[in-house]
């Protein structure tokens, strides 16, 4: 006989076990989009303790809708090896242009990221950063519904040696530093230019403040670089670059 209270206990106890186990991290990633999940995957494979915090119910960022709701994405030659790493199928459309199914990309990256050892907490919003001695050293979290309803509920803190802002176009985590005058400006993303946007996404993936990295569209927003639309190679390469740099700094 099934008991309702046992079901409840199983969920509550297992969830809070995960939460307690992830209050002290090597890396806290904010945003479970393509660059965030790829960063998490490579970090976990490299031996880092990492969790991703996503304010939405679903993960995957902008992958699902492809271009204008046509659920296909394009990846360029330079990033094809990451599709191979995740065992994602693709077809060559023209030389240097590879098309993949957006649903397969989102679900496969998510699955392999979790299986690599990354814990993803969805419906958890990061509302601030922990900054000590001029260095980002953690995140401040609350339930997304609490933020949506405007209830005055104090948050909790997660400590991390590094934080990655993978929140996309708004660079929402880096905005906390701007708000407090710890960085001078965030110019925002430029107009659409796929070639330059893809190139600069990787170049702009860096530590913008001690302890804080930016990836994906957050990297371009912080640097004022162009957007690129439904081509995702830059997102994947950006996540991998951040992961590799952080692993080196962690000595892993």
Swiss-Prot record:
GO terms for molecular function: iron ion binding; pentosyltransferase activity. InterPro entries: FAD/NAD-bd_sf, Thi4_fam, Thi4_prok. It comes from the Archaea. It catalyses: hydrogen sulfide + glycine + NAD(+) = ADP-5-ethyl-4-methylthiazole-2-carboxylate + nicotinamide + 3 H2O + H(+). Pathway: Cofactor biosynthesis; thiamine diphosphate biosynthesis. Keywords: Iron, Metal-binding, NAD, Thiamine biosynthesis, Transferase. It holds the Pfam family Thi4. Fe cation binds at residues 154, 169. Its EC number is 2.4.2.59. Its cofactor is Fe(2+). One of its GO terms (biological process) is thiazole biosynthetic process. NAD(+) binds at residues 35, 54-55, 62, 126, 152-154, 217. The keyword RNA-binding does not apply. Glycine binds at residue 227. Belongs to the THI4 family. Homooctamer; tetramer of dimers. Involved in the biosynthesis of the thiazole moiety of thiamine. Catalyzes the conversion of NAD and glycine to adenosine diphosphate 5-(2-hydroxyethyl)-4-methylthiazole-2-carboxylate (ADT), an adenylated thiazole intermediate, using free sulfide as a source of sulfur. PANTHER family: THIAMINE THIAZOLE SYNTHASE. HAMAP family: Thi4 (MF_00304). This is Thiamine thiazole synthase. The lineage of its organism: Archaea, Methanobacteriati, Methanobacteriota, Thermococci, Thermococcales. The gene is thi4.
